[in-house]
């Protein structure tokens, strides 16, 4: 993988979190659009497969962005794949939710798998 490709992945991973935490919806979605010329697939592991990944992102933004802030605990990038360990801290201070997020970038397509600790 080229340095340019790795930098694009790093920019996406860190940028989307920054936009989420700052309430910048347009910036958040622009980060996703920049990496998904050929499509986007989002899966919540252990739940039924979604039908429209963009609707999933819209729903996440509407339901979760006002309630939680993302704290990045770890980000590992290997080739065209990344694993992120996040703590989604409740903005009201009442706990949070741990997630492991897997990203695969391939030819303008992005696959995302969310593992959510209940």
Task: Walk through the language-model features, giving the residues of each.
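A solvent-exposed, acidic/Ser-Thr-rich amphipathic alpha-helical stretch
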Residues: 6, 25-79
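Hydrophobic pocket/interface hotspot
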Residues: 16, 28-32, 40, 57, ...
């Amino acid at each position: 993988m080229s340095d340019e490709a790795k930098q694009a992945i790093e920019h996406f991973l860190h940028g989307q979190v920054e936009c989420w935490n700052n309430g910048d919806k347009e910036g958040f979605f622009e980060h996703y659009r920049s990496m998904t010329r050929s499509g986007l697939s989002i899966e919540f592991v252990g739940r039924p497969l979604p039908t429209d990944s963009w609707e999933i992102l819209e729903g996440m933004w509407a339901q979760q962005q006002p309630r939680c802030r993302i704290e990045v605990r770890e980000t590992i990038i290997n080739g065209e794949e990344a694993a992120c360990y996040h703590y989604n801290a409740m903005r009201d201070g009442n706990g949070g939710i741990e997630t492991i997020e897997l990203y695969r970038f391939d030819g303008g397509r992005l696959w995302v798998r969310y593992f959510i600790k209940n």
